[in-house]
UniProtKB/Swiss-Prot annotation:
It comes from Gallus gallus (Chicken). Pfam families: RRM_1. Residues 91-221 are annotated as: Disordered. One of its GO terms (molecular function) is pre-mRNA binding. GO terms for biological process: mRNA processing; regulation of alternative mRNA splicing, via spliceosome; RNA splicing. PANTHER family: GLYCINE-RICH RNA-BINDING PROTEIN RZ1A, SC35-LIKE SPLICING FACTOR. Residues 14-92 form the RRM domain. Extensively phosphorylated on serine residues in the RS domain. This is Serine/arginine-rich splicing factor 2. Keywords: mRNA processing, mRNA splicing, Nucleus, Phosphoprotein, RNA-binding. Residues 117-171, 179-189 have a biased composition (Basic residues). InterPro entries: Nucleotide-bd_a/b_plait_sf, RBD_domain_sf, RNA-bind/splicing_reg, RRM_dom, RRM_dom_euk. Necessary for the splicing of pre-mRNA. It is required for formation of the earliest ATP-dependent splicing complex and interacts with spliceosomal components bound to both the 5'- and 3'-splice sites during spliceosome assembly. It also is required for ATP-dependent interactions of both U1 and U2 snRNPs with pre-mRNA.
């Protein structure tokens, strides 16, 4: 368990990955906790190269697979040093120590999210972030263009409806005026022309009966 020694022979062992550890949790503490469920072969806590502090996760090796499964079921969600542990089966083997990796090939990088998962390079993260940003921008642009097109279609439909209503009102007013003019012309044609006073007097005189000779003599005397 000392960090200066090379890793032991872990072939045939079952490894558990323990996440969400505090910086003060030691390998001895983990061994005491996990030995309740079976024989522990190895406990390894990766540390930072420069600060030498714990990276917040560890690997616990069991000689028997059934003991490892029992420990995983019991310790997943348990609280240790004020932290709720997350325990799962490790996917790959334990990485070698830093001093031992100088002689051999460079070790694989193991992230804190899952054992055996390679940490993504910052370039890939930047690319993924830029892609997500471009996607969000394109989505926002498409939504903005859709709202613009909808507002345009609405304004067009409103203007067309207004023009149609104006045309209808104009046609109605013109038809009403035409009907009024027609009725006036008909009433004028039906009414007889007015007669003057002279014509009426002459007609009344012509209609009066002729006077007798006796009436004429009396008038002359």
């Amino acid at each position: 368990m000392s960090y200066g020694r090379p890793p032991p022979d872990v072939e045939g062992m079952t490894s558990l990955k323990v996440d969400n550890l505090t910086y003060r949790t030691s390998p001895d503490t983990l061994r005491r906790v996990f030995e309740k469920y079976g024989r522990v072969g190895d406990v390894y806590i990766p540390r930072d190269r420069y600060t030498k502090e714990s990276r917040g996760f560890a690997f616990v090796r069991f000689h028997d697979k059934r003991d490892a499964e029992d420990a995983m079921d019991a310790m997943d969600g348990a609280v240790l040093d004020g932290r709720e542990l997350r325990v799962q089966m490790a996917r790959y083997g334990r990485p070698p120590d830093s001093h031992h990796s100088r002689r051999g090939p460079p070790p694989r990088r193991y992230g804190s999210s899952g054992y055996g998962r390679r940490s993504r390079s910052p370039r890939r993260r930047r690319r993924s972030r830029s892609r997500s940003r471009s996607r969000s921008r394109s989505r926002s642009r498409s939504r903005y263009s859709r709202s613009k097109s909808r507002s345009r279609t609405r304004s067009r439909s409103r203007s067309t409806s207004k023009s149609r209503s104006a045309r209808r009102s104009k046609s109605k007013s013109s038809s009403v005026s035409r009907s009024r003019s027609r009725s006036r012309s008909r009433s004028r044609s039906r009414s007889p022309p007015p007669t003057s006073k002279r014509e009426s007097n002459s007609r009344s005189r012509s209609k009066s009966p002729p006077k007798s000779p006796e009436e004429e003599g009396a008038v002359s005397s």
